Amino acid sequence: MSANGAASAVAEALCDARAEDVCVFDVSARCGWADFAVVATVPGLLHGTHRLVCEQAARFGLREVHRKKRGLCEEQWRVLDFGSILVHLMSAQARAFYDLDRLWQDCLVAR
């Protein structure tokens, strides 16, 4: 499956998990380390959604590239690195503050 297809499948899984305002961005022309970024607002704790995304990604042969120990600050924003796909799980407050949607507004593939 292509990176585009995998990013779309991850976005669909996030929607099924009741994540809000899920967006897929094609960032390949703007960043050298990933092709797609999926950004989602997650109500509640992020770790359950993190696990679900990893399970869905594994179905497409994707594994987290740079997995690190998680800290308390990551209950506001977690970045999951699957190589060509970055998944940003954010609280509503973190999403409003960092405003990745504005940063990548010209790269939007799907909302």
From Swiss-Prot:
Keywords: Cytoplasm, Repressor, Translation regulation. The keyword Isomerase does not apply. It is found in: Cytoplasm. Its main location: cytoplasm. Coiled coil: none annotated. One of its GO terms (molecular function) is ribosomal large subunit binding. One of its GO terms (biological process) is cytosolic ribosome assembly. GO terms for cellular component: cytoplasm. Functions as a ribosomal silencing factor. Interacts with ribosomal protein uL14 (rplN), blocking formation of intersubunit bridge B8. Prevents association of the 30S and 50S ribosomal subunits and the formation of functional ribosomes, thus repressing translation. Belongs to the Iojap/RsfS family. This is Ribosomal silencing factor RsfS.
